[in-house]
Amino acid sequence: SRAPVIFRNTPQWFVNIDKDLKDGKDEFGKTIRERALHSIDKLVEWVPQSGRNRLHSMISMRPDWVLSRQRAWGVPLTCFKKKGLKPDNEDFILKDKKLNERLVNILKEEGADAWFQEGAKERFLEGLYPPDEYEQVMDILDVWFDSGSTHAYVLRDRSDGKWPADLYLEGTDQHRGFFHSSLLQSCGTQGQAPYSGVLTHGFILDEKGFKMSKSLGNTVSPQQVIKQYGADILRLWVAQSDYTVDLRIGDEILKGVTDSYRKLRNTARFLLGNLGKYSGHDNVSYNELPDLEKYILHRVCEIDKKIKSSYQDY
């Protein structure tokens, strides 16, 4: 909106990432930070390696996680605080197993809206605690907590799911987003990262390196490229690109790809044309080949091994 930002101190709910959780899941560390750093270093494969370095630096230096937000609607924190007590008091937050079970059952049946309905506090506390002695917390969770918990209901709690996930795949901006929140949430509840591998890709920019935007009129759609240049040109552009960094695309770049495509196509046509009547009866033994042809075969063999190895490693 380009409006000025106003900073002000307000009460919020935090997750202490350096507190000993004492949850019996301390194989990889006692605190969320310890578990996260161990997971980054020992349990997760990073493609490219720079992704590991970036997230490791963020986790090492980050403060506690601010969980709460003040919005009209969202996933509620679903907790009650005792009136007249301060946050450092052990009884400040109402902790009760029966109450938690009631909350889970109602929210599972009716959704998050049940928390925001009129009379919700009285309904949840009925028969357990005097409603007048408690204040219902109306803050919602950070939306990154929502996405960060997907490992539980998408993977762990599904019969066809596998936990941890083989791979989390997102753009470079998700080191501070999805990868980050998923790691903290999982380390707090499960003791380790929810993924075995993380692959980070760059973004597609216009020919001059600017972010694509409808307002700037510099967007390039795949359909537009295919219509103008053909699907094979787009495929070749993708195949020869390093997806781990930001990529540029535009008319001049695609013209260069078209030239490369013509060279490949003409070379293939030349080879096929000369091999049209080849039956295998005129084979020349390896020992009788000229040194240059032996070298070419050697390079082809090296490339073949490298490609197969890369496919298997991936």
PLM feature spans:
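Primarily the internal scaffold of c-type cytochrome electron-transfer domains
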Residues: S260-Y261, H281-P290
